[in-house]
């Protein structure tokens, strides 16, 4: 693909130049080629976007529920019509295989938008009788202008997960995509405008998180920030949001999730789940089950089943329909993952497979890392304690149910957890003791629109998707009505 034209900001229904004068480049990580130069939003641009959003939000909130629902449904239709085009752009920008982006990224994002478009008429208040002459009623009102700050691993899906409930509740959103993968969020802005969204209701500000993101979190005109990213950045977002104007926050901050295989499990099923929990999207998924706990007596057999499945991974041309494994998103991220792999070797974990970059034709110029499995791991190893966010699985052994529950919970994270077992009683007994916000039994990774997703502990605050997220983008107003004569004590 030839280099794209310089990408601008999207404010008030159209593209506009950044006033900052700064730019950055976005690359294709499969081969290192520059895709585009992108303009970076500065403080003045954030001010412009907020003013635009305030204007648009008033128009948007004044529409009826059915009017807003119809506009969002039109956006869903356009997303699905342009699925292949958007998937190709997402593949170029992220490096993910087209077989994945064309069937997951836009599809699941559109599903969430359709879900919330249907829920708009369900946003309602309540009526509370006090006595014969008085009652209270409540209204759910939009917050106003909110901000979404996205991560680089699911660019358009995250933009939709954040914008769908915000817009459905009558808010306007200013979205800052990751500077690593900024392209599809701009296309989403075009689609919203084409669907009939009033100007300013969805503005996109590409830029560096430490600058553009900080300006958004500090801006007094923004009522809420929804952030997806790392723990350290999340703490800064939360501190800035509170210090500036006590903004509400929703945060999804990653994890180091356990996958527990019990001794009664079908090991073929367990191996299939472990592969999806570690190598889908080349391991760049927040919920990945990177700590795989296996009964000691099953370890050797489980390892052989994993090795057989690693042989079925197909890395290569990301547009080949047979490819199911792409490069990492950037060269700095590749280098960070390689540092973790080196640390795992240094601390005594045994490399079952992988452990290096992929080499040869089609790989040498890209950010490729081989699917890597460590075994003979211990809980104190760096690769077991810290989030790697790459194609690195750690296999650990255990002896008893109580032991594995304790060890699974021994982490600062609490995003996801899963178990594989044939015992229904054990499944629910164990899941109820695991400290994680998203749990799976005999499966892994699906996050449908109806399912609230979010973490315990350092893995986040609040939830995305589900009815509760729609409500979190509203504020409740209580009104008392008195029909009798008011009595004063004065």
Curated annotation (Swiss-Prot):
This enzyme catalyses: betaine aldehyde + NAD(+) + H2O = glycine betaine + NADH + 2 H(+)
> Which NCBIfam families is this protein grouped with?
BADH (TIGR01804), PRK13252.1 (NF009725)
**Where do the annotations place NAD(+) binding?**
150-152, 176-179, 230-233, 254, 286, 387
The root-end lineage is:
Bacteria, Pseudomonadati, Pseudomonadota, Gammaproteobacteria, Enterobacterales
Q: Which organism is it from?
A: Escherichia coli (strain ATCC 8739 / DSM 1576 / NBRC 3972 / NCIMB 8545 / WDCM 00012 / Crooks)
What PANTHER family does the annotation carry?
ALDEHYDE DEHYDROGENASE-RELATED
* Pathway membership, UniProt: Amine and polyamine biosynthesis; betaine biosynthesis via choline pathway; betaine from betaine aldehyde: step 1/1
InterPro entries documented for this protein: Ald_DH/histidinol_DH, Ald_DH_C, Ald_DH_CS_CYS, Ald_DH_CS_GLU, Ald_DH_N, Aldehyde_DH_dom, BADH
Which residues of this protein are annotated with the site description Seems to be a necessary countercharge to the potassium cations? 248
Q: Name one GO molecular function term.
A: metal ion binding
Query: Record's CDD domains?
Result: ALDH_F9_TMBADH (cd07090)
| Pfam family for this entry, one | Aldedh
The family assignment reads:
Belongs to the aldehyde dehydrogenase family.
Name the record gives this protein: Betaine aldehyde dehydrogenase
């Amino acid at each position: 693909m030839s280099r794209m034209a310089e990408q601008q900001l999207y404010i008030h229904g159209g593209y506009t130049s950044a006033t900052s004068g700064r730019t950055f480049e976005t690359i294709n990580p499969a081969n290192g080629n520059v895709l585009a130069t992108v303009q970076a939003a500065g403080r003045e641009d954030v001010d412009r976007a907020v003013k635009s959003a305030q204007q648009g939000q008033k128009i948007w909130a004044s529409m009826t529920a059915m009017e807003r629902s119809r506009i969002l449904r039109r956006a869903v239709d356009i997303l699905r019509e342009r699925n292949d085009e958007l998937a190709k752009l997402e593949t170029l920008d992220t490096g993910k295989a087209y077989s994945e982006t064309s069937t997951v990224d836009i599809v699941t994002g559109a599903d969430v938008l359709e879900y919330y478009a249907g829920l708009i008429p369900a946003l309602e208040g309540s009526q509370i009788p006090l006595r014969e002459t008085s009652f209270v009623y409540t209204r759910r009102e939009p917050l106003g202008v909110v901000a979404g700050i996205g991560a680089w691993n699911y660019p358009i899906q995250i933009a939709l997960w954040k914008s769908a409930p915000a817009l459905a509740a009558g808010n306007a959103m200013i979205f800052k995509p990751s500077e690593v993968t900024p392209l599809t969020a701009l296309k989403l802005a075009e689609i919203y405008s084409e669907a009939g969204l009033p100007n300013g209701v969805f503005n996109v500000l590409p830029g560096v998180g430490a600058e553009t993101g900080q300006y958004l979190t500090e801006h007094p005109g923004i009522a809420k920030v929804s952030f997806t990213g790392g723990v350290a950045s999340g703490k800064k977002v939360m501190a800035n949001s509170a210090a500036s104007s006590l903004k509400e926050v929703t945060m999804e901050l990653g994890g180091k999730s356990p996958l527990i295989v019990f001794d009664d499990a079908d090991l073929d099923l367990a191996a299939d789940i472990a592969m999806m929990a570690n190598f889908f999207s080349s391991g760049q998924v927040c919920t990945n089950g990177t700590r795989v706990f296996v009964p000691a007596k099953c370890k050797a057999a489980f390892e052989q089943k994993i090795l057989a499945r690693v042989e079925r991974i197909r890395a290569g041309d990301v547009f080949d329909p047979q490819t199911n494994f792409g490069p990492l998103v950037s060269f700095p991220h590749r280098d960070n993952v390689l540092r973790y792999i080196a640390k795992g070797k240094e601390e005594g974990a045994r490399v079952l497979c992988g452990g290096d970059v992929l080499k040869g034709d089609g790989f040498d110029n890209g950010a490729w890392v081989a699917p890597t499995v460590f075994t003979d791991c211990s809980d104190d190893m760096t690769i077991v304690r810290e989030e790697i966010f790459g194609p690195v699985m750690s296999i650990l052994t255990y002896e008893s149910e109580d032991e594995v529950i304790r060890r699974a919970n021994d982490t600062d994270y609490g995003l996801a957890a899963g178990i594989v077992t044939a015992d229904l009683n054990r499944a629910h007994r164990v899941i109820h003791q695991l400290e994680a916000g998203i749990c799976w039994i005999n499966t892994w990774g699906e996050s449908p629109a109806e399912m609230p997703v979010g973490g315990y502990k350092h893995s986040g605050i609040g939830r995305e998707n589900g009815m509760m997220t729609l409500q979190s983008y509203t504020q409740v107003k209580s009104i008392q009505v008195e029909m009798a004569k008011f009595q004063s004590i004065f």
